[in-house]
């Protein structure tokens, strides 16, 4: 089921799910990320889980810690609904899960159960997974050819919500229509006459952000950027000039996990692993340690959607790097430095095991989460969203840019702020 913003996809899915439950039909609700599952649960009024949590099971310690196999599907005669399916990829840099292809594993898991059906829900105008041009889970022809499945497809196109009253929806629709037409001529965004969309200059930004933190709360306010470099600058400015944080890392800070971690969840009953994209609040900052050429701090974290607080070593170096997480070169450097501690272990296999169990080697990789890239924001929604367009050269407005902008626009529920958007992109009043 494909549908653009405002076409009633959310309302329709909620109605279908709840009608099925009234007929005592088994349903399972899934989404690619924890935040997307939270949004899905919120509008359907039913529990929703991440795909990973539902379909994978960790191997025992003897087989390999942090390795997840496809689990047993005990559901029969069940409809599996998967929201935000545009985010589901074919391949992964993280091969710790199943075959390494989330789409392959999801389909295999669902149909391993007797008489199950799968409903994939998403918006084809959003950003596809990194590294591909389209979202494979929303391509009916691809699914039919690749998996030999019979596909029934519905595409919601008519705007059902009143876009005349919503600047967010009105402009998102205009951007999406440009994507659909394959035309990337100059698009003018309409701000005048809409109370929910506001242009903000650099000089007004901090005051507006501070006001949103007061009105909507920090957890319901997000800045979305084009790059990690820009997000770092915003995070630095917000911490220093709004939150008045003098230390490089403080209690109360909002952070995002930027790499899956299988080490620190092991001692907690309800935590299989800590996921890339999870947002956490720093509850307590413990001792600092400089080791192996990197900086670590022992930290207690309250992670969004988790029942228990987690105590772990976190790596501070990733807070300011312009890469999404620790680079391959730095990871290699850390590995070799840790290995030096175990050179007295003659067996390479035993030495490797020691490194894999080293708590600093397994430190959580984090970034501040007051501002994030659009890929990191995908699947989530916030009451107030600030969009930083970054560099706005003429040749930068290609298909990827408009998908980026559409995805960023549709993260906002109540208020959208356009930071330093050029006059040439804004429709003149009157």
What are the residue ranges of the model-derived segments?
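Structural beta-sheet core signal
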Residues: 29, 119-120, 223, 387, ...
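Short, solvent-exposed amphipathic alpha-helical segments in soluble enzyme
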Residues: 45, 238-242, 403-406
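Conserved helicase motor core of P-loop NTPases
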Residues: 110-116, 124-283, 287-326
């Amino acid at each position: 089921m494909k549908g653009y913003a405002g076409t009633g996809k959310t309302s329709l899915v909620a109605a279908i799910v709840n009608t099925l439950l009234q007929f005592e039909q088994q349903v399972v609700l899934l989404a690619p990320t924890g935040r997307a599952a939270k949004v899905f649960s919120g509008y359907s009024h039913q529990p929703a889980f991440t795909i990973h949590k539902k379909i994978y099971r960790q191997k025992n310690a003897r087989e390999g810690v942090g390795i997840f196999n496809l689990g047993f599907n005990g559901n029969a005669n069940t409809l599996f609904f998967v929201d935000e399916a545009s985010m589901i990829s074919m391949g992964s840099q993280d091969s710790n899960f199943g075959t390494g292809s989330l789409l392959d594993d999801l389909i295999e898991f669902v149909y391993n159960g007797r008489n199950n059906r799968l409903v994939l829900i998403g918006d084809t105008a959003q950003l596809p997974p990194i590294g591909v041009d389209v979202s494979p889970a929303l391509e009916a022809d691809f699914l039919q050819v690749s998996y030999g499945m019979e596909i029934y497809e519905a595409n919601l196109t008519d705007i059902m919500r009143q876009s005349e009253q919503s600047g967010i929806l009105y402009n998102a629709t205009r951007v999406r229509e440009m994507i659909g037409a394959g035309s990337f001529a100059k698009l003018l965004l309409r701000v005048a006459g809409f109370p929910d969309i506001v242009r903000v200059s650099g000089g007004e930004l901090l005051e507006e952000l501070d006001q949103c933190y007061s009105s909507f709360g920090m957890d319901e306010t997000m800045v979305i950027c084009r790059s990690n470099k820009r997000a770092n600058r915003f995070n630095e400015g917000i911490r220093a000039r709004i939150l008045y944080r003098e230390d490089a890392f403080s209690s109360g800070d909002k952070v995002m996990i930027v790499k899956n971690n299988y080490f620190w969840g092991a001692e907690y009953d309800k935590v299989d692993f800590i996921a890339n994209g999870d947002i956490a609040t720093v509850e307590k900052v413990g001792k600092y340690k400089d080791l192996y050429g990197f900086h670590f701090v022992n930290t207690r974290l309250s992670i969004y959607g988790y029942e228990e607080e987690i105590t772990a070593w976190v790596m501070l170096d990733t807070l300011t790097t312009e890469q999404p997480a620790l680079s391959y070169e730095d990871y290699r450097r850390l590995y070799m430095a840790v290995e030096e501690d175990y050179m007295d272990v003659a067996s390479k296999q035993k030495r490797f095991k020691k490194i894999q169990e080293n708590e600093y080697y397994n430190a959580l990789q984090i970034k501040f989460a007051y501002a994030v890239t659009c890929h990191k924001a995908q699947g989530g929604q916030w009451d107030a969203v600030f969009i930083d367009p970054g560099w706005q050269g003429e040749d930068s407005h290609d298909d990827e840019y408009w998908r980026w902008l559409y995805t960023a626009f549709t993260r906002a529920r109540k208020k959208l702020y356009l930071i330093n958007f050029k006059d040439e992109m804004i429709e003149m009043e009157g």
